Amino acid sequence: MTYSVDKVRADFPVLSREVNGLPLAYLDSAASAQKPSQVIDAEAEFYRHGYAAVHRGIHTLSAQATEKMESVRKRASLFINARSAEELVFVRGTTEGINLVANSWGNSNVRAGDNIIISQMEHHANIVPWQMLCARVGAELRVIPLNPDGTLQLEMLPNLFDEKTRLLAITHVSNVLGTENPLAEMITLAHQHGAKVLVDGAQAVMHHPVDVQALDCDFYVFSGHKLYGPTGIGILYVKEALLQEMPPWEGGGSMIATVSLSEGTTWTKAPWRFEAGTPNTGGIIGLGAALEYVSALGLNNIAEYEQNLMHYALSQLESVPDLTLYGPQNRLGVIAFNLGKHHAYDVGSFLDNYGIAVRTGHHCAMPLMAYYNVPAMCRASLAMYNTHEEVDRLVTGLQRIHRLLG
């Protein structure tokens, strides 16, 4: 299949709009990606003609909605090559998925004196839940330090493991630096020390294929909204043996087998015991449409196109005076930068005047900002619908800002 970015862009209605009188150049997909018509229409069609509460309903609409929901679980399992659809839990997003693991598996398996390993490049969603768990139980949080080029000091990792290490929680791809971590060797090392591994895949699954069986990770979590799907829906993968042992962390409808005021409550089996309450069925339907859309394009095709675009962007940005880039040469999805001594917010505001949308701030990665000794960065992210012309506009915009501000 020949990849046509023009055909892809035609599926995204928002990309035809203007901002400040100029065509929108949306370079903020790492924060949240735009949605194709196929996703918008699938969710709207469900609410127009197919909506009902799922599970236990005897009527046709409920049965059909349940079938559609569970078919998305199956599609998602194929998308990441899980052994079974029953290894996947629907969550609100990556953040909830990590908190679920921390509050269910973590509360049951991490004790005083144990330790958890994370890295200095993590998103707050893969830091704060582990800080909270360690504070609750008296465990230690250990950190893999960064190199200046945005890679991890992996030579330090063996020294962080010991017989008390219970978990390695690591990002697949940094949301700021674009660094893709060498998961295979990290996971092997963790398992050699008897530790489990959680992978934050929020910035990976849209850029290339992910195979959780090949990785052999114990947990893998990602969000739908960065994968061209709706907000408020994501996937937590857990190896089946682990998932069946984990207790629920939220109580309510749908996650019970029996409820008795005198004899207490028993839980239904996983994954449904982790899905208390009425689910975001519309979001699940939209996620299914997003998975179908991306799969039809082919993740390998997307990866090839995006990597060519990334190489072009990095080469063109070399022409911008006083531009500092953060992260390795080989990266996925994002380019973080600062322009001279100007605050990222000012640079981002000027770019917005030119119709260019980038993200500014600490990117939910304050420890990483502290490492580079900056309060904030600009971040341009490249997705499957971005073009070489949009990269040229970014470069021209930065050159113009440099001339204006000095």
Swiss-Prot record:
PTM annotation (N6-(pyridoxal phosphate)lysine): residues: 226
EC number: 2.8.1.7, 4.4.1.16
Catalytic activity: (sulfur carrier)-H + L-cysteine = (sulfur carrier)-SH + L-alanine; L-selenocysteine + AH2 = hydrogenselenide + L-alanine + A + H(+)
GO molecular function: cysteine desulfurase activity; pyridoxal phosphate binding; selenocysteine lyase activity
Pathway: Cofactor biosynthesis; iron-sulfur cluster biosynthesis
Subunit structure: Homodimer. Interacts with SufE and the SufBCD complex composed of SufB, SufC and SufD. The interaction with SufE is required to mediate the direct transfer of the sulfur atom from the S-sulfanylcysteine.
Record's protein name: Cysteine desulfurase
Organism: Escherichia coli O7:K1 (strain IAI39 / ExPEC)
Classification lineage: Bacteria, Pseudomonadati, Pseudomonadota, Gammaproteobacteria, Enterobacterales
Gene: sufS
